[in-house]
A protein has these predicted regions:
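C-terminal domain-boundary segment and adjacent tail
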Residues: 1-8, 48-51, 137-138, 169-185, ...
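A short, Lys/Arg-enriched amphipathic alpha-helix followed by its capping loop at the start of a domain
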Residues: 28-38, 243-247
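Metal-dependent polysaccharide deacetylase catalytic core of the NodB/CE4 family, i.e.
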Residues: 34-160, 177-194, 219-228
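Boundary/entry segment of secreted carbohydrate-active catalytic domains
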Residues: 1-27, 193-196
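Catalytic-core region of carbohydrate-active enzymes that cleave or remodel glycosidic bonds
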Residues: 131, 135-139, 159-177, 197-219, ...
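N-terminal accessory interaction module
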Residues: 91-102, 108, 287-304
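Hydrophobic "anchor" residues on beta-strands that sit immediately upstream
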Residues: 15-16, 65, 254
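Active-site metal-binding loops of divalent metal-dependent hydrolases
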Residues: 18-21, 70, 228, 259
């Protein structure tokens, strides 16, 4: 009998997905999760090289995953552009009914219900994704960025999803919204529309459900988000600390990894082949299994 596990022979993974690259808040977040062995992904959209060096970013985010969160953090402009003001943008004097040009062609300042934001034409949006990809990989290394996270949630564009797959080979795009336990904590298979299970609002409650979730023989997935500054604004760093202390440093029960690593591992388990009395691992990933109750591993590109 073949049983599939995560590394460490556990069946539950824990990760996080944190947006925007707020340096001070990300530092505080990391200071809580990292000592407890909890890993995840930071979704970045820009660098402040006037203040921080590439080495600073590499050191700060070392050991974590990095995803593309789109340069300039725009909405997608849908329909006609609308009226564009001639004068330069000034948030204090701008007409809220008009658009204002930014430094990037096809990207405009506009007034949303919660203040001034940016939106981009489809062409400009795709260009910003590519610019962000190049800048991230220049800092973190070629091949370090393999997925996309929508600014402001899923913008409903099949064209953009096709673009990130064809241009950059991305295998996942994260939207916004707490899934909680609605999927039975299954590893997302619709990777172009996946979302996290919990945020600062329900982290401890959802984690308790996850811990109690019965082992049904399948690999499970729990990710929480969504901005480090959320924990500051809601005054709930204590809840994050409680979560990290309670659910961290338990490698025999939880697998801690960046989101993309969990997805790749899961996909590798689904690629296993059983032929007669042989188990074939055609992937480049070591897979943890039990055969007739005995723990073992399937080395990359191996047959046992």
């Amino acid at each position: 009998m073949l049983e599939i596990f995560y590394p460490g022979w556990c069946r539950k993974a824990i990760s996080f997905t944190i947006d925007d690259g707020n340096i001070e808040m990300d530092k505080k977040f990391i200071s809580i999760v990292k000592p407890n062995g909890i890993c995840g992904t930071f979704n970045l959209c820009s660098f402040n090289f006037d203040k921080y060096t590439p080495d600073f970013y590499r050191e700060m985010y070392e050991g974590f995953g990095i995803a593309n969160h789109c340069k300039m953090h725009p909405f997608l402009l849908k329909g006609e552009v609308g009226e564009v003001a001639d004068e330069p943008f000034n948030a204090n004097t701008a007409d809220e009914s008009k658009l204002y040009k930014t430094s990037k062609e096809g990207v405009y300042h506009f007034h949303a219900p919660n203040g001034w934001r940016r939106k981009a034409t489809l062409k400009a949006y795709c260009e910003l994704i590519t610019e962000c990809h190049a800048e991230l990989e220049a800092v973190f290394g070629e091949g370090s960025v393999a997925s996309f996270v929508w600014p402001f949630g899923d913008q409903g564009s099949a064209d953009i999803l096709e673009y990130i797959k064809d241009r950059h080979g991305y295998g996942a795009a994260r939207k916004t919204g707490n899934m909680e336990d609605s999927t039975g904590f299954a590893v997302p298979t619709d990777r172009m529309h996946w979302s996290y299970n919990a945020s600062h609002k329900n982290l401890l409650d959802c984690a308790a459900k996850y811990e109690a979730y019965e082992d049904d023989g399948e690999l499970k997935f729990f990710a929480f988000g969504v901005h480090s500054v959320d924990y500051e604004n809601a005054h709930c760093w204590d809840e994050l600390s409680e979560f990290a202390t309670k659910y961290g440093n338990r490698p025999s029960e939880f697998y801690y990894a960046p989101v993309d690593d969990i997805f790749r591992y899961y996909d590798a388990t689904k690629a296993l082949k059983i032929e007669e009395n042989k188990i074939i691992n055609p992937t480049n990933i070591e897979i943890f299994v039990k055969i007739d109750g005995k723990p073992t591993t399937l080395p990359p590109r191996s047959t046992i």
